[in-house]
């Protein structure tokens, strides 16, 4: 029920990673990367399916060897979400996964090798209709740029990216996106800002090696949040030393917070205090776990008392305000019913699921009328 995002997104050309449009007016895509051994086909397929179930639009898979490339081919046949092959050092691996049906090739200019090798990769991508991601990273800049700048800088990242963008331009290849990642928030943000002024290709955002679940979430939220608020970014990956599914959850929470994209429930909850009339934290933990399967966008407020509860509830699809002797439930901004604490989570879950079904039915009717 909240207003649309005021953010004006940067104009970028559109490419497709598999069936997913990236750039232009397409929704910002949320991406993650497997952390299984790619040679373990079953484990990698299982993780990709978990990521897809969590809402991943695109999944990147590391392909470090030719044996891994063959395993990638088996993996690709068993999943439906678009896959990006992460290639370093050996360009021949990129040529092989292109033959095996990869949806996008990620190459690192700092280690892929001579221009003739890049040309071979571009020729393969063109032949198979595959986009490329130029993935520049502060930790693996070309040696001449390391010598020129002395240390990684935003300017070094952008120069590396532009060097290879210009190479693709000379080869008349425009089907690519670009990233300029660093673990330092200031460096990454500055590099992306500079690059956004110079090219119109889609930008893949990320703070590389951001850290564990807590610290990585904070660092990524600051860096990516700054850029997204400026309209910069067409795909995102929240890099966490954690279960990759958490990357998807954090990514969507980030986009929901900026009203750029909604998937699943957007919870508004107070931190609780002595005025609470029910266990706010316990209720929230239970609801988040139970309703993790819902993908339909919905605003749900859970507020422990009447100080802010009614105001938040009036702006939510469903709002719970703590009260004595019973808690008040708002639906579509209007008081609807009262719930006691005895079965609060069960009753609230049922109301939320009913609202989701109602919203989904309304959307189906709208689609049917417009067909």
UniProtKB/Swiss-Prot annotation:
First-tier enzyme category under EC = oxidoreductase
What name does the UniProt record give this protein?
A: 4-hydroxy-3-methylbut-2-en-1-yl diphosphate synthase (flavodoxin)
Gene name of this polypeptide: ispG
Q: Which biological process annotations from GO are given for this protein?
A: isopentenyl diphosphate biosynthetic process, methylerythritol 4-phosphate pathway; terpenoid biosynthetic process
Q: Which GO terms describe its molecular function?
A: 4 iron, 4 sulfur cluster binding; 4-hydroxy-3-methylbut-2-en-1-yl diphosphate synthase activity (ferredoxin); 4-hydroxy-3-methylbut-2-enyl-diphosphate synthase activity (flavodoxin); iron ion binding
Q: Which reaction does it catalyse?
A: (2E)-4-hydroxy-3-methylbut-2-enyl diphosphate + oxidized [flavodoxin] + H2O + 2 H(+) = 2-C-methyl-D-erythritol 2,4-cyclic diphosphate + reduced [flavodoxin]
Its Enzyme Commission number(s) read 1.17.7.3
In terms of domain of life, where is this protein from? Bacteria
Annotated positions binding [4Fe-4S] cluster:
270, 273, 305, 312
């Amino acid at each position: 029920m909240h207003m649309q995002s005021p953010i004006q997104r940067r104009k970028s050309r559109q490419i497709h990673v598999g069936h997913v449009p990236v750039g232009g007016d397409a929704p910002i895509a949320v991406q993650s990367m497997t952390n299984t051994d790619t040679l373990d086909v079953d484990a990698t397929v299982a993780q990709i399916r978990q990521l897809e179930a969590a809402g991943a639009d695109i999944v990147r898979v590391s392909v470090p060897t030719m044996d891994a490339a063959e395993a990638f081919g088996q993996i690709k046949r068993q999943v439906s979400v678009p896959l990006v092959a992460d290639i370093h050092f050996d360009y021949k691996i990129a040529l092989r996964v292109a033959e095996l049906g990869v949806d996008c090739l990620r190459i690192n200019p700092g280690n892929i090798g001579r221009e003739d090798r890049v040309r071979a990769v571009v020729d393969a991508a063109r032949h198979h209709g595959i986009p490329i991601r130029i993935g520049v990273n502060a930790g693996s800049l070309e040696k001449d740029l390391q010598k020129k700048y002395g240390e990684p800088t935003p300017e070094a990242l952008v120069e590396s990216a532009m060097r290879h963008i210009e190479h693709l331009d000379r080869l008349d290849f425009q089907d690519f996106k670009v990233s300029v990642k660093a673990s330092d928030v200031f460096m990454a943000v500055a590099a992306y800002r500079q690059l956004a002024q110079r090219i119109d290709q889609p930008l893949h955002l990320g703070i590389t090696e951001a850290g564990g679940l807590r610290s990585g979430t904070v660092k990524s939220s600051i860096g990516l949040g700054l850029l997204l608020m400026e309209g910069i970014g067409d795909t995102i990956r929240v890099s966490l030393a954690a279960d990759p599914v958490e990357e998807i959850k954090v990514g969507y929470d980030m986009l929901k917070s900026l009203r750029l994209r909604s998937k699943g429930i957007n919870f508004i909850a107070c931190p609780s205090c002595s005025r609470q009339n029910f266990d706010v934290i316990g209720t929230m933990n239970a609801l988040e776990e139970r309703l993790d399967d819902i993908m339909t966008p919905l605003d749900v407020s859970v507020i422990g008392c009447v100080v802010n509860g009614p105001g938040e509830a009036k702006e939510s699809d469903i709002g719970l305000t703590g009260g004595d002797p019973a808690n008040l439930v708002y639906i579509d901004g209007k008081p609807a019913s009262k719930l006691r604490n005895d079965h609060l989570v069960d009753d609230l879950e049922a109301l939320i699921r009913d609202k989701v079904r109602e919203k989904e039915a309304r959307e189906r009717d709208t689609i049917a009328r417009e067909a």
